[in-house]
Amino acid sequence: MKTIHFDMNKYETHVDLEYLKEHGRVEKISDGVIFCSGLENAALHQAVLIDERHRGVILELNEEFVGIGLIDKTNDILEGMHVGVSGKFIEVDLFEEMAGRIIDTTGKMLYEESEEKPTATSPLFCVTPAIMTIDSVTRPLNTGLAVIDSITPIGRGQRQLILGNRQSGKTQIAVDTIINQHDQNVHCIYVAIGLKAAYIAEVIETLRNHGAMEYSTVVATAASDSLTAQYLTPYAGMALAEALRDQGKDVLIILDDLTKHADAYRAITLLFNRPPGREAYPGDSFYIHSSLLERAVQMNEEHGGGSITAIPMIETLSDDVTAYIPTNVISITDGQLFLKSDLFNRGQKPAVDVGVSVSRIGGDAQHPIIRKLSKNLTLILSQFEELKELLDFGNALDDGSMKMVSDGRLLTELFKQKILSPLSVTELIVILYAFQNGFLTKIPPANIQTFKGLLLEKAHMHKDFESFSAQIEAINELNESHVEMLEEIIRETGRLFS
């Protein structure tokens, strides 16, 4: 067999092979992704420029082409246009002060122009912290919601999933949690992934009206933005969180929501002709979420002592938690809050289903007094749900069972909470102490909310309550003076209520 020797010198036009290593040509365009030739030195997640002006990122590499996702939605890209790699991996710009900013996936300000230059950058994709740099979760992150802080507490450095149907109150829990951090020295990052622009604006306005934008950053892509921008958004939020964590800060990141993130990634991979798997999602769907969420940790003191607490959200269909994406994220996180539409429609807000919700490591971070006052609340609510079904069928119950029903009904009413009205640790202690010591047994369930409002009002009027609140972090158990104060507050409220 004769060997064919290819001699380029016999041709008048020479091909610059070195040029092709860093440059390429648009060969095909398809719904926000482009197929490109050349770019032999291209690497996954490298930033590129198409025609020197359109931003993109390399998302697919194979023998035939380089797949690029367009960050900016545009119809101006044509076949044959020049593509050049920047030599950098996709990054988010960081500024001296990040609080109050509303940015896109690369750190560019949204809704307003800014001449300020970035002081640093942070890579969107990086490895998770080494296990020897991570510490245990021992400090609480209080949401201000009684049912969560008492039964399914969250610690700083934890990953706690919120899942439920549409319109079941997922975002409201996140917003309440952000607002509750106003005096907790926590930087909050709200990441909106593929939501309606009007909805994002509403959340931002709520945060601004409650002063929460003073310690918060919003990373947002709307449903009208490109698929690639939606896919990159949570990584941009996490990159910003890591930069703040490395400064020794505590960070709370809300990911709203990862269902839309998975849908955007599915669409991108199908456009690149990757083989679909379960529910048409690609085979690495688990990886894209695990590699994201495992970056949320509590660092040890030798590595700054900062933390990232992640609260991702997942939208379910008909309360089905066995679908592909929900089961994936449940297995990645340290616990989940399951919101039921049935509870929400009955006026139980937050609509947390205590029987399915769990916090695997948050209990270690819970305040000792709240942990003691909350130890049997899950059992009370579980027994109430079981016995309530018997009552619905008209079955007679013994006195012991009726006591369980009465306690469960009281506790259910006690856990109802108006939106944008978070409770402090000491306010929660007052409420739980009143319940656990039988002070609410004579209060009709219909009047519990009124009684709770009067109780908290009376607590703030008590001469010792302010000093009790100031010292609560250092108090591990209630002493005689604390008990005397609490019972005095409850008795005074009882006299007012009667």
Curated annotation (Swiss-Prot):
Its EC number is 7.1.2.2. It comes from the Bacteria. Gene3D superfamilies: 2.40.30.20, ATP synthase alpha/beta chain, C-terminal domain, P-loop containing nucleotide triphosphate hydrolases. Keywords: ATP synthesis, ATP-binding, Cell membrane, CF(1), Hydrogen ion transport, Ion transport, Membrane, Nucleotide-binding, Translocase, Transport. One of its GO terms (biological process) is proton motive force-driven ATP synthesis. The record marks 357 as: Required for activity. It is found in: Cell membrane. It is a peripheral membrane protein. It catalyses: ATP + H2O + 4 H(+)(in) = ADP + phosphate + 5 H(+)(out). Its main location: membrane. The keyword Transcription does not apply. One of its GO terms (cellular component) is plasma membrane. GO terms for molecular function: ADP binding; ATP binding; proton-transporting ATP synthase activity, rotational mechanism. CDD domains: ATP-synt_F1_alpha_C (cd18113), F1-ATPase_alpha_CD (cd01132). The keyword Nuclease does not apply. Produces ATP from ADP in the presence of a proton gradient across the membrane. The alpha chain is a regulatory subunit. NCBIfam families: atpA, PRK13343.1. F-type ATPases have 2 components, CF(1) - the catalytic core - and CF(0) - the membrane proton channel. CF(1) has five subunits: alpha(3), beta(3), gamma(1), delta(1), epsilon(1). CF(0) has three main subunits: a(1), b(2) and c(9-12). The alpha and beta chains form an alternating ring which encloses part of the gamma chain. CF(1) is attached to CF(0) by a central stalk formed by the gamma and epsilon chains, while a peripheral stalk is formed by the delta and b chains. Belongs to the ATPase alpha/beta chains family. This is ATP synthase subunit alpha 1. It comes from Listeria monocytogenes serovar 1/2a (strain ATCC BAA-679 / EGD-e).
